[in-house]
Amino acid sequence: MRKLLLATSFFVLALSTDIFSANKPQAGTKEQPAAIIQTTMGDLNCVLFPKAAPLGTKNFIELAKGTKDWKDPRTGQTKHGVPLYDNTTFHRIIPDFMIQGGDPSGTGAGEIGIKFKNETLSNLGFDHPGRLAYANAGPDTNGSQFFITEAAYPSLNGNYTIFGQCDDASVALVKKIAREPRGRNDKPNTPIIIKHIKIDEGTH
């Protein structure tokens, strides 16, 4: 079973500009929800992009809330009404690049029985730190695993679905997490746990 790995090439593509950036935490609304990723090292605050990535955003919200069924890769059992991300880990951390999590197996190779197509836009690229995107094992193999970048990384453009943007304080936390001691396959020596992902869709 192939692990969901990201290309680490430093080949630089032309930068694109877009309006999707966040300097500070933003409250969620029905039109643009926000995700608060609560970890054992602090909270990551990210706005989501339902217009740019409707499939990816919907999938993330439903898995976070537990309103979408998924298969536990450790047991093969179908989970119903269970938030997928609770008590999972960031299983891969790379300084100057990103942190990756969202696999219930904690290995990067877990299959949850969900795959959906890539959603990429020419004006939405990895030209900002703090991009929230799906990891994949090739085109149209998105599931639950996601990564957050700590720097602009335009060589990823067009290959991964960006569905959110984390604020500056969250990028600082990503950098801190990415520099934790790590071992084989860039796995942290001490587990960095995602305790819960809260979805803020406003009050209206």
Pin down the residues of each PLM region:
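Sec-dependent N-terminal signal peptides
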Residues: 4-13
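Cyclophilin-like peptidyl-prolyl cis-trans isomerases
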Residues: 14-204
